[in-house]
Amino acid sequence: MENGAVQQLQLLGKRVKGFGVGGRYVAHPYYSGRFRELLGCTPFPGTLNFDANLDWRELASMCEPQVIPGTVWDGVRLGAVYVWKAKIMTRHGYVDCAVIRPLLSGHPPTVLEIVACEKLEPILENNPDKTVIVTIACKRGDALRWRRY
């Protein structure tokens, strides 16, 4: 495969409850501008959390993330965030999204968050077992095989 070619990595996980603070960070001007660049829209002010059964560090080693660096904004420390461009399967088909892992997260290392242009819960509600299927676009020079978790 050509160096820099886009390859795909599929993650299979279960929705989990968050801490209720994702919306505040997604809506923050520092982060929302970065998500707007990546997604081409103003992101919905909230995240959908899922347990990917894959440690975020393993994901980062397999699929290099974009990094939103940490900063201090009006005296408040904002942590760095790893970001992967992705698509999430919904009852309407695939929807563009970003899979993120805030480096200051209080979640276990297998919990990732999804940012999208629209609220995802309503278009995932017909999924009683709370399964989440996400396809991440990876840019890597090495051969990465399609994997399911």
From Swiss-Prot:
Per UniProt, Mg(2+) binds at: 47, 49
Q: Give the co-factor note.
A: Binds 1 Mg(2+) ion per subunit.
Task: Name the SUPFAM superfamilies on file.
Answer: Riboflavin kinase-like (SSF82114)
GO MF terms on file? magnesium ion binding; nucleotide binding; riboflavin kinase activity
The EC number(s) attached to this protein equal 2.7.1.161
Q: Where does FMN bind?
A: 105, 113
Q: What does this protein do?
A: Catalyzes the CTP-dependent phosphorylation of riboflavin (vitamin B2) to form flavin mononucleotide (FMN).
Q: What class of enzyme is it?
A: transferase
Q: Which GO terms describe its biological process?
A: FMN biosynthetic process; riboflavin biosynthetic process
Organism in which the protein naturally occurs = Hyperthermus butylicus (strain DSM 5456 / JCM 9403 / PLM1-5)
* Pathway the protein acts in: Cofactor biosynthesis; FMN biosynthesis; FMN from riboflavin (CTP route): step 1/1
**Homology family:** Belongs to the archaeal riboflavin kinase family.
Q: Which cofactor does it need?
A: Mg(2+)
Q: Does the keyword Transferase apply?
A: yes
Give the domain of life. Archaea
Keyword set includes Ligase? no
| Catalytic reaction list | riboflavin + CTP = CDP + FMN + H(+)
Q: What is this protein called?
A: Riboflavin kinase
Positions bound to CDP: 18-23, 118-121
Q: Which UniProt keywords apply?
A: Flavoprotein, FMN, Kinase, Magnesium, Metal-binding, Nucleotide-binding, Transferase
